[in-house]
């Protein structure tokens, strides 16, 4: 199959799978609905109680699973492109832990104030990335050193987060603990503001910068010869990736491994780097939607935080990836 046809097939297949999983998620739960009831509720012609179940309880969760998964997929693709390293992702480097530190500070100081949570998550992610970048700088950036320092910063931030939880009230600690596991439980449309619009804005920013990202993949000298400001472009792309991670953390907590795994699966499916961000977004959305469905259904009537499922599957994938990289060397 020609690459262009294979690319189109993979994008179409991912989109169809996302749509099917989304509809299945809307009909399944403590109250199982027919497909006709789901579509009637979406069109506003179902009874009021069914419409409320679908549009107010389940649809926000499904929509945010797709949006957050896509955001993490794009963020991971940008990091792996900039670092030229398959282990380059915001969760491995600790950026989502930094964003979570910001969320935790906001919850301790301001309670569950959504605007404060979003902006402190952004601040935490940006400050963490600047700290990692500053410590890794030695007349330039070596990606291996950057990742190792990121892992170290992540460990220190986890210790800081544990200390904050111990200082918080019992109610705040319980809420923060559930959020820390990475959860889409209890999401409503009101809880998506202002993080969801920020993710959409960052998607637009990523699309505007995708050409620069592809030129940077050719090497700094080649990109510079083609008129690209290397450091400025790298900084803008990094900012977009960090804000995508921070906004996702503000909505659902620090969900791990989606950003690491989605770009790899996207490349394997398509066999090309073209449309890399689109493929990574679709893979991320599909992975998180599937993980959330598993978290809801596997242990009924109990529901797991979706982060437990992604960590379990992502940990296995990370081991396989490390073994493959060691064999190459």
Question: For each predicted feature, which ranges?
Answer:
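Alpha-helical transmembrane segments in inner-membrane proteins
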Residues: 1-329
């Amino acid at each position: 199959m020609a690459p262009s046809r294979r690319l189109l097939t993979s994008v179409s297949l991912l989109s169809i799978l996302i749509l099917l999983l989304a509809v299945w998620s809307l009909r399944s739960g403590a109250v199982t609905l027919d497909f006709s009831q789901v579509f009637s509720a979406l069109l506003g012609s179902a009874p009021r109680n069914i419409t409320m179940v679908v549009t107010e309880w389940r649809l926000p969760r499904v929509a945010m699973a797709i949006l957050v998964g896509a955001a993490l997929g794009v963020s991971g693709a940008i990091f792996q492109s900039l670092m030229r390293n398959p282990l380059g992702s915001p969760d491995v480097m600790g950026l989502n832990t930094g964003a979570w530190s910001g969320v935790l500070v906001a919850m301790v100081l301001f309670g569950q104030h959504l605007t404060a949570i979003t902006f402190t998550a952004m601040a935490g992610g940006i400050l963490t990335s600047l700290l990692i970048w500053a410590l890794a700088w030695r007349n330039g950036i070596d990606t291996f050193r950057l990742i190792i320092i990121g892992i170290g910063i992540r460990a220190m931030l986890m210790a800081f987060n544990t200390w904050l939880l111990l200082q918080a009230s019992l109610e705040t600690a319980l809420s923060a603990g559930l959020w820390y596991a990475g959860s889409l439980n209890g999401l409503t449309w009101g809880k998506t503001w202002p993080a969801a619009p920020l993710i959409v804005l960052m998607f637009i920013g990523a699309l505007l910068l995708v050409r620069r990202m592809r030129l940077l993949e050719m090497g700094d000298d080649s990109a510079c010869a083609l008129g690209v400001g290397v450091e400025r472009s790298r900084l803008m792309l990094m900012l977009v990736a960090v804000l995508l991670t921070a906004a996702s953390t503000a909505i659902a907590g620090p969900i791990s491994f989606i950003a690491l795994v989605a770009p790899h699966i996207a490349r394997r499916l398509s066999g090309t780097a073209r449309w890399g961000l689109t493929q990574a977004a679709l893979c991320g959305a599909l992975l998180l939607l599937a993980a959330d469905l598993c978290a809801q259904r596997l242990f009924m009537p109990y529901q797991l935080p979706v982060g437990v499922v992604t960590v379990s599957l992502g940990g296995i994938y990370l081991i396989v990836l490390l073994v493959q990289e060691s064999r190459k060397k």
